[in-house]
């Protein structure tokens, strides 16, 4: 009876391990097929798909995270952290193995990016260097942000707490976001606030620029409070 129980337990462990390996392999295979094209669409500096796969730290970090996350889900927490720490040393990007990362997530440049344990990053999100998806409380529950499909997080932005960044939203460079952002909105500043339609025309390109964001937000607030402006 005892031997049968041990044999059954060993079989379940082996089955679980094989299932984890199979799942991780499928995710990595998908990433290898999809990530180079996703990066090329967003980075004009790319010369080839081989360059993306072998030399881009954001791609390496995502692929390593697939392994770390698979180990984390299999309760192999030490091994998972070892993989994530090795990835951080190589890429400069820190993704906790518990974080959920979707498909075609582009981490551009990537140095200094930190993604916390309970963060959720959905498909087609773009994250630039220096971004923090962090927690605000020392609790063992959901405490990191959820980034919905297609959102963009600009250089050096901090998105903190169990909040939601809506689909296709854009977070300006250097912004500090402490509350939910609606789908499709553009926000900037410290603390971040939404850029009004009049101000959005002042923001060049697809991702809000920190200086332009600050100027636009100041002008909106000054206008709303009847503060006189000095024109050059």
Name these PLM-found stretches.
Residues 91, 96-97, 102-103, 108-117, ...:
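Left-handed beta-helix
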Residues 165-168, 173-232:
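Extended alpha-helical regions
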Residues 140-144, 200:
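Conserved phosphate- and dinucleotide-binding cores of soluble alpha/beta proteins
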Residues 1-91, 202-232:
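Terminal amphipathic alpha-helical/low-complexity segments used for targeting or macromolecular assembly
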Residues 50, 57-58, 63-66, 99, ...:
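Solvent-exposed, flexible loop/coil residues
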